[in-house]
Amino acid sequence: MKLRDIIDSPCGLRYVIDSLPLASGYSLRYLMDTEALTAQEDIAAAYSRMREHLSAAGDGNLVSMLHSILCSLKDISHTLSRIEAGNTVDDIELFEVKALILLGRRVSAVLEKASQASIAPHTGDLEDALKVLDPDGTEIASFYIYDSYSPELAALRADIRREADADCRTDLMDREQALEAGIREELCRTLRPSVPALRKLQEELARLDIDLAKAVQMLRMRLCIPEISTSGVTSYKGMYNPYVKEVVERAGGEFTPIDLSFGDGPVVIIGANMGGKTVVLKTAALCQWLFCFGMGIPAEEALIAPRERVFFISGDAQDMGAGLSSFAAEMKAIDGVVRASAEAQDGSRIAAMIDEPARSTNPIEGTALVEALVDILGQREVALLLTTHYNIPSSHCTRLRVRGMEDGKMNYRLCPAPEGDVPHEALNVAESLNISPEWTGKAKKLLEYE
């Protein structure tokens, strides 16, 4: 699974990625094509790199300087492939190769001067390639077929400058072009062995841009570096959703951070609409995916277990293109989790966050479907986090609920929900929205609240 495959998942992932202060568009494309990390050692290495970049990220002047250099990083993979295949490229493409080497040298020099050599790209293998493209040693970011490449070419150009006759000049210029073509061919032949090192440099520069952006984002947004869980349990202290937090604070409100733990048996969150259940689910999915790509986690503290597959099923899953209703599309999506867990050698390597499954069907069948789902995935040790309106027995899961209305304000923190504890928050929420007292009052009488 690549980042681009899940970027538009409705959990706030795009907001976090769009907030990365990347210098280069190529770096963003490189990041989008990155595969999710599933092995503990790979995830540990990713966060080790982030720690290495934190010192540089805290130096505003250094970050600005690197940003101004890395913004010119381009993807020249096509040019490198052409050279590797034995093709002769033009002057613009040769300039791109030279510019890449010079860019790498500039970045390395800046980092070494700032005592950050440990994160600098390696350009030592490309000294010979630079000499080929910069025979005069000017280190200027430009390229043409220099006189230095051929005494014959230099003499011919001098003749062209002196020649007054137009026809003679044309003949001389034709000879010049033929000589230049031969030199380009030889340059490409000479550069061919350096293509692997050039590719490596391009990727190192993109990774530097990405890792530095991750570290800067972590400091700016006060994210945390998670601990890696080896027990299968994932837990968060002070977890929040950056996108929702910004929206709430922009409206003058205050976002409530959440403490959450799951992975040791299914966890079911019950409660009314507007109770924050879906936000908890979305934030848990967001954190798991950020973890898969070695990014800062929006929480005070985080302990996260690596997963091979992550499922997030939320909202209206209606697939009009496939001719499916909301219920049918939702059932097919959830069935994908059930089948994946059946095929997996270790169900604990799967995480599933499912928002109010079977909510669009009748309560009797809906309760049966959800209870069966929790039982099946629980037996297979899937790390299941599920929200529902239905009253699911605690024998199948750990039940949590949103605290709800307290002193006229909504408390979104989670607390245990004992067996038979069905939260009655719908009318409280309705009253907080100034819904017609006639309506809510009659509903209370019907429920014998009064």
What are these regions (language model features)?
Residues 84, 213-223, 291-300:
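Active-site phosphate-binding and catalytic loops of NTP-dependent enzymes
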Residues 200-245:
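Charged, amphipathic alpha-helical linker segments immediately N-terminal to NTP-binding catalytic cores
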Residues 58-59, 187-192, 267-271:
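Glycine- and acidic
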Residues 124-209:
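Extended, charged alpha-helical coiled-coil/arm scaffolds that mediate oligomerization and mechanical coupling
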Residues 49, 75, 79, 186-187, ...:
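A general alpha-helix detector
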Residues 229-450:
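ATPase nucleotide-binding head domains, primarily ABC-like/P-loop NTPase cores
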